[in-house]
Amino acid sequence: MTENSTSTPAAKPKRAKASKKSTDHPKYSDMIVAAIQAEKNRAGSSRQSIQKYIKSHYKVGENADSQIKLSIKRLVTTGVLKQTKGVGASGSFRLAKSDEPKRSVAFKKTKKEVKKVATPKKAAKPKKAASKAPSKKPKATPVKKAKKKPAATPKKTKKPKTVKAKPVKASKPKKTKPVKPKAKSSAKRTGKKK
């Protein structure tokens, strides 16, 4: 019972005010929404075009311009309309319901594109660094760097080993040659003593 008693007195003064101003047209918010839907501009409809539509289709009083400005601001603050251009009541306006799904899809596409573009850039940098030293294998950069260092060191050590080995082999036969005649002379001496 309390809900009905509070709602009925609030509705009566609204009807009285509307009847005094004009009973031939609906609410300004409804007329503005109808004007935007009728124009169907992708860029949005301006306040002047909304005023022309309302004046041509509805019987509006002299204060229609000021009422349209106020109602446009209210619709923008409540979220029914979205302002695409301009500030305040000036500029172009769209219905928020039709724009929300389109914009959300557009933002998702741009995020995916940014991620795709960022990944090849990161992969391209290590390829350039790897291609400078070994041109054959430009794929796994961290593994290559570890392999390059040990591969370079044994090459340096092999060269001095080959140089040292040659004089050692040549010196061995020289030492063995003078040993043989000494053994022969000792054998001759033993034969003479007998």
From Swiss-Prot:
InterPro entries: H1/H5 (IPR005819), Histone_H1/H5_H15 (IPR005818), WH-like_DNA-bd_sf (IPR036388), WH_DNA-bd_sf (IPR036390). Residues 105-194 have a biased composition (Basic residues). One of its GO terms (cellular component) is nucleus. ADP-ribosylated on Ser-104 in response to DNA damage. Residues 1-11 have a biased composition (Low complexity). Coiled coil: none annotated. Histones H1 are necessary for the condensation of nucleosome chains into higher-order structures. The histones H1.0 are found in cells that are in terminal stages of differentiation or that have low rates of cell division. This is Histone H1.0. It comes from Bos taurus.
